[in-house]
Amino acid sequence: MATSFFRRLARSAPITFPVAFGSQSKSGSGAFRFSTGAIAALSGGFSYYYLTSGNNLVYLDQAKEETGPKTALNPDKWLEFKLQDTARVSHNTQLFRFSFDPSAELGLHVASCLLTRAPLGYNAEGKTKYVIRPYTPISDPEAKGYFDLLIKVYPDGKMSQHFASLKPGDVLEVKGPVEKFKYSPNMKKHIGMIAGGSGITPMLQVIDAIVKNPEDNTQISLLYANVSPDDILLKQKLDVLQANHPNLKIFYTVDNPTKNWKGGVGYISKDMALKGLPLPTDDTLILVCGPPGMMEHISGGKAPDWSQGEVKGILKELGYTEEMVFKF
């Protein structure tokens, strides 16, 4: 029954990232931490970190006393989560469901991600080398006993290839959560969102939080860019949300449209932003997440220290200030 539902979800919703980390250091238990800058780099989705560590791994059954009976994640220890099922969503995207204690919630907050890691062999000192990658679950944060990850598999992606190799019953090492952006209901009257590809993931967390809360009157405007219509992750889910919630407006644009495509064509332009985003005011917030090239074009990238940095690109030209823009 659960497997059948999961595969229907994959077919019907082409839907798909971690606790203060200091710079890499070892404790007596072999634990290591990451700098805030490292997390920011990872959270952009385009950098990989190859790190070594002792076996700072705790099995989920062992971790219950430390993490509490209702929260599965641990911000300080890597935990193993078992793969329950997987389903193909598109030519390069798969949906993965991982299970844990059915009485517990994952423990993920709105606009936060978790870290995943996979071994890459050993370094010259004989210590395990890892690739570490952040992902945002697409499942309901309040769901008990499981979480879902939508993974775009790249031919040269070390972490995504690790995901592709997993079979039901295999385990994934996970750590978190990491809060990237603190959302509170009605914090702004109007939130604009610009997403590219899998950059839709943190946007979906915020959208879900707003539309699920009848007391939250925030207006949402989303501009979502992809290569082709087939590459639009979460489109059916987003369309349903838009149809059922008048405070959500979505505009899609693709580089390679099909014959019957009715959305925008090409990169997100100044004109698209002008028509699709709220005007720059003190009650406006613009969230941006996507590939580095898109970020530079829209908002400018983050600063060298991975802080938010100066607002540049289209948003600067339209009058948005640093206080009005958040870059994931």
Curated annotation (Swiss-Prot):
Pfam families: FAD_binding_6, NAD_binding_1
Keywords recorded for this protein, A-Z: FAD, Flavoprotein, Mitochondrion, NAD, Oxidoreductase, Phosphoprotein
Domain FAD-binding FR-type residue range list: 76-184
GO molecular function (one): copper ion binding
InterPro entries associated with the record: CBR-like (IPR001834), Cbr1-like_FAD-bd_dom (IPR008333), FAD-bd_FR_type (IPR017927), Flavoprot_Pyr_Nucl_cyt_Rdtase (IPR001709), FNR_nucleotide-bd (IPR039261), OxRdtase_FAD/NAD-bd (IPR001433), Riboflavin_synthase-like_b-brl (IPR017938)
GO cellular component: Golgi apparatus; mitochondrial intermembrane space; mitochondrion; plant-type cell wall; plastid
Enzyme class at the top of the EC tree: oxidoreductase
Necessary cofactors: FAD
Location(s) in or outside the cell: Mitochondrion
Catalytic activity: 2 Fe(III)-[cytochrome b5] + NADH = 2 Fe(II)-[cytochrome b5] + NAD(+) + H(+)
Primary localization class, coarse: mitochondrion
Residue numbers carrying Phosphothreonine: 201
EC number: 1.6.2.2
Protein family (similarity comment): Belongs to the flavoprotein pyridine nucleotide cytochrome reductase family.
Purpose of the protein: Desaturation and elongation of fatty acids.
Name by which UniProt lists this protein: NADH-cytochrome b5 reductase-like protein
Taxonomic placement: Eukaryota, Viridiplantae, Streptophyta, Embryophyta, Tracheophyta
